Amino acid sequence: MWLGALLDTLPTPALTIDRTTAHRNAERMRERCRALGVRLRPHVKTHKTLEGGLLATGGTRRGIAVSTLAEARFFADGGFDDILLAYPVPTARLEECAGLARRLDAFHVLLDRPEALASLRQRPLGHGKRWLVWLKLDCGNGRAGVRPTDPAALELAQAIANDAPEEVTLVGVYAHCGNTYGCSGADTIQAIARTTTNAVLSFVAALRQAGVPCPQASIGSTPSCSHPIPEMSQLTELHPGNYIFYDLQQTQLGSCQPQDVAIRVLTRVIGHYAHRGQLLVDCGWAALSLHGAGAGQGPQGCAAIDGHPELRLVGLTQEHGLLEHAGGQMDFGRFPVGSVLALIPYHACATAAMHPVYYVHEEGKVVALWHPVRGW
């Protein structure tokens, strides 16, 4: 019922996506990968939609990374294939993984411990299928993965490749340079990207020297892939995800310019409180998330108000937000009750996860509704 609607008529809070900007972001990342001569495997966890997946893959429906089994099933149902679960293989849900592996031409899993490999071997796929395994490397991010300098990493890769080749195949190595999210500017982002790339390439070289074939080498994060370095051309693929929308955090990091941010959360003014100098709006943390509130930032770190740098977000409860003038008197006449403001969220992935529908717009009108998958 909302197709063709003007944005200021939408029920709020409403998550909106500028179609032109998202298309431009997707094409720019594809072009970066083409220029490097590497494959783009877009991570779809930011949007979790078939439409976003089509946009990111250029319509091929092949070669994506997902963060949950629910996403994997959803995209498989939507005709996607060559799906990588970018999460250490959940051995408690191995039957679900096996079902996807049998169903798809290529369903890839990550592992970083021998016990996970043993679980895969205890659950052979049969029917001529093999588990497609990537070794997860930790090149400084400090989350999942084995350190490439640890001798156990080489031993695990050798075991994946050699212990049961009729059941398990080593596809490649996978590293997420999430430590780029602690950067401020292209130079520091590229320094981490270079360290990660070199660590991955050195590990692949060590594998090959040991007689272990390693066809694929993949790294990713939106900051690193937004400022690619020449060394990345020696990899086989990149796997960023947030870039399709970008967000306030990415502009602060230096990954993008403000005009590259496609996502907004529309909110209505629902109250004036002159004695406090505050506007009340109908967007709380349930429509925005609390990402960005850390490091002493408080609510103002969670979002910026588009077109109104004089306003700041000072309070967030579940369904309410409070705005103040950053350095003077609030002009309530400029923001009557019922007027609509647009918030630029700090973290698009977290904010998008709060909404059941995205209103995609062009020239001020809704042109599509995207419905994301939810759950795990």
From Swiss-Prot:
Presence of the UniProt keyword Nucleotide-binding in the record: no
Subcellular location per the Swiss-Prot or TrEMBL entry: Cytoplasm; Cell projection, Dendrite
Protein EC: 4.3.1.18
One GO cellular component term noted in the UniProt record for this chain: dendrite
GO molecular function: D-serine ammonia-lyase activity; pyridoxal phosphate binding; zinc ion binding
pH effect on activity, per entry: Optimum pH is 8.5 (at 37 degrees Celsius).
Reported cofactor(s): pyridoxal 5'-phosphate; Zn(2+)
Modified residues (N6-(pyridoxal phosphate)lysine): K45
Record GO biological process: D-serine catabolic process
Binding site for pyridoxal 5'-phosphate: Y174, Y181, T222, G241, N242
Database matches in Gene3D superfamilies: Alanine racemase, D-serine dehydratase-like domain
Main location: cytoplasm
Tissue: Expressed in kidney, specifically in the proximal tubule epithelial cells (at protein level). Expressed in the liver, specifically in hepatocytes (at protein level). Low expression levels in cerebellum, brain stem, midbrain and cerebrum (at protein level). In the cerebellum, expressed in Bergmann glial cells and astrocytes (at protein level). In the cerebrum, expressed in astrocytes (at protein level).
Residues that bind Zn(2+): H347, C349
Keyword list, A-Z: Cell projection, Cytoplasm, Lyase, Metal-binding, Pyridoxal phosphate, Zinc
Keyword match Cytoplasm: yes
Catalytic activity of the protein: D-serine = pyruvate + NH4(+)
Regulation: Inhibited by hydroxylamine and aminooxyacetate.
Subunit note: May form homo- or hetero- dimers.
Family: Belongs to the DSD1 family.
Biological role: Catalyzes the conversion of D-serine, an allosteric activator of the N-methyl-D-aspartate (NMDA) receptor for L-glutamate, to pyruvate and ammonia.
Name of protein: D-serine dehydratase
